[in-house]
């Protein structure tokens, strides 16, 4: 039984390793040199509008790395030793931030009962994710509350801040945490956290002192300020042009729509009037008079015109006419009646064919 208690639980170890991997991904460090990764320039587009006094510790350190990496990317011919110093400073700031992130992860893993958890303000993560961190540091990740009076006197945003603004706010946050740990931290872990935070604060103060004495950094800030002013003026001018073009296009489209509506209404009215005035023409039926269907005595009948012989009928007619005039008239009438039936059928048959 005693041996089973001493055997480590493999499931718990694997879960702890996965959690550490996820926490390292969440607190992924950013470096300014070629050995690591540079801070993305999209950071300014996303968080540059936030005031420095309300920004989180994570954003303050991120924008400080961004500022130093920007200086280190310049040519040495222009800024001389400042570019080399900025690259070294970016490495040091990145190392101290890695240490700070590691302290927060250790606090969440195994030191939740220490006073450091209260200083870092460790809270449970409300958004549950698969294999994700269950806790996070409000002190490191969330913003800082500042009243309106302080915001009015300190309106500098992250994108416009220089190294002095960022270092001043970082040392202020670190100093408050160190003061609380010094007064209330009793465990060895609290002392360990306090010492690391003190080292980070000391280095930031030394960095600010060096930049303040460097005249090249002042020239760099003047150059950045002039470039920012040029970009701002260019942006405002283009924005005004776009607004003017949009307003003119809107008025043009509105007037054009009204004219087209009026023209279409007039066209519809004309079509209605034309359709009401016009009367559909009904085709007339062709009527053949009955008199045209009767044969002519002594002339050419319709049957003869169609190419049919009437020899038998003509012989009988001649014999009947020579006997007597009275009988011929009667017989001719009878023959007319007989002949009117036959030619009618033949003529209509020919017409149908």
Curated annotation (Swiss-Prot):
It comes from the Viruses. Residues 1-24, 245-280, 305-353 are annotated as: Disordered. Residues 9-24, 321-332 have a biased composition (Low complexity). Residues 342-353 have a biased composition (Acidic residues). Residues 254-280 have a biased composition (Basic and acidic residues). Signal peptide: none annotated. This is Uncharacterized protein R616.
